[in-house]
Amino acid sequence: MIRRRRLRASENLRALVRETAVSASDLIYPVFVIEGKDIKNPIDSMPGIYQYSIDRLDEELDRIREAGVKGVLLFGIPAHKDECGTEAYNEHGIIQEAIRYIKKVFPELVVIADICLCEYTSHGHCGVIKDGIILNDETLPLLAKTAVTCAQAGADMVAPSNMMDGHVAAIREALDEAGYEMTPIMAYSAKMASGYYGPFRDAAHSAPGFGDRKTYQMDYHNPREAMRDIQDDIDEGADIIIIKPALAFLDILKTASWETDMPLCAYNVSGEYSMVKAAAANGWIDEKKIVMENMIGMKRAGAQMIITYHALDVANWLKEE
């Protein structure tokens, strides 16, 4: 008889033969920074997550430092929005000033700047609009300028999330020309037009004012198209590839791990987070067990790193083990 249970007999024995693990250094924590003073706004649809003004960031940075999380992904929420999202590439915009502040007080933290226009445009779309159409090529210089200003402010990495064709190449060229050839690009290469983003759009004030984003974000029915998009971004100079959302697209993550040797990042998005939080609040699930199972699922599928709103909880739970 084959007895698989021999290696399951105790927790320590199971730990010895365990094939997949997650650590605090695998985690990236999203942080929302809002223009203004003395602001800590709870995000109702994302329990435990807040918008912070720069002068209130220290309390969040203290939590990150204590948990042992090594990286943050920054999203800016400006006071002023316009048709072209000019605050995104303002050298003294909210995201640029937040980067400067964090690198001053917590220099060892890896600061990743999200590069998109949707939080900064009055219409909530990720590019320049004319006659209701998102203009791809006209948007690229604005994204490139945003990336350069973030690098100038001290960002360790930029993460273009806008899904315009050619955006990685445009950003790579602009960074290189500005002397930031060593600034890596973490590209949202397989970013689906997903229903899982709703709570994030509340948090970042970035819901589109009309229509949707299906003309530029990926159709989630198409796994082969996802691999083409991933390869395009690699060819254009991406250093890390993001699959977003993660849990409904573990097949894309696994295929990418087979077909490329690039570092892969799973984005455990707001809707995934909020569903767990809601079920846990109602006593329907054990939050820690579900979250850790999700983390391992993403790692097992091939993610070297995970962007997750659970990051601080996970890091603290790992300390307890």
What are these regions (language model features)?
Residues 1-18:
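N-terminal amphipathic/basic leader segments beginning at the initiator methionine
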Residues 10, 22-28, 34-321:
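Alpha/beta enzyme core
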